């Protein structure tokens, strides 16, 4: 079986970390051990420095929306070229915490950047590279933010108003619905039901590979 790139997407508080572990466990059950785990933004020394700027900003200078967007893509291509593509070439599966869909949703939907700009930037930076499977953990923004606040202090993105996250969710759904490479999981259910739905959908996908 050819190595695949699987990405978990979703709003804050959607349960991505739990879902990632469930994906890793499901892969192991199919004999796929020790996948490369990545996160965005971040995942390489340079990309982690960019992550810090994106997440926390700078006390003496505001980070503009365009600078944020370009930092995200700079961090992304560092990760893709230096970690993800080499791992796939070596036959290792990759499980990612966020990828390009997050930028399309947060910056395109939430920040309001033009769709054509977002698509052109994606195509310029990534070309035709994309995940083999994206698992989108869908959750109502209000519930998701309640969960996120329960984890502790929020970063600069998590502090955005709820309308930002409603716009981001709408774009996530727009990108996910009727997309054969995306599985949508209702993350607002109980953990037991989320786990069951995710396991069933992922096993069905793996059996077809």
Swiss-Prot record:
UniProt keyword Nucleotide-binding present: yes
One BP term from GO: dUDP biosynthetic process
InterPro entries assigned to the protein according to its UniProt record, in alphabetical order: P-loop_NTPase, Thymidylate_kin-like_dom, Thymidylate_kin_CS, Thymidylate_kinase
Pfam families, sorted: Thymidylate_kin
Keywords noted in UniProt: ATP-binding, Kinase, Nucleotide biosynthesis, Nucleotide-binding, Transferase
Enzyme Commission number, as recorded: 2.7.4.9
GO molecular function, one term: ATP binding
GO cellular component: cytosol
Catalytic activity: dTMP + ATP = dTDP + ADP
Binding site for ATP: 10-17
PANTHER family the UniProt entry points to: THYMIDYLATE KINASE, UMP-CMP KINASE 2, MITOCHONDRIAL
Family named by the database record: Belongs to the thymidylate kinase family.
Role played: Phosphorylation of dTMP to form dTDP in both de novo and salvage pathways of dTTP synthesis.
Protein's name according to its UniProt entry: Thymidylate kinase
Organism classification: Bacteria, Pseudomonadati, Pseudomonadota, Gammaproteobacteria, Vibrionales
UniProt gene name: tmk
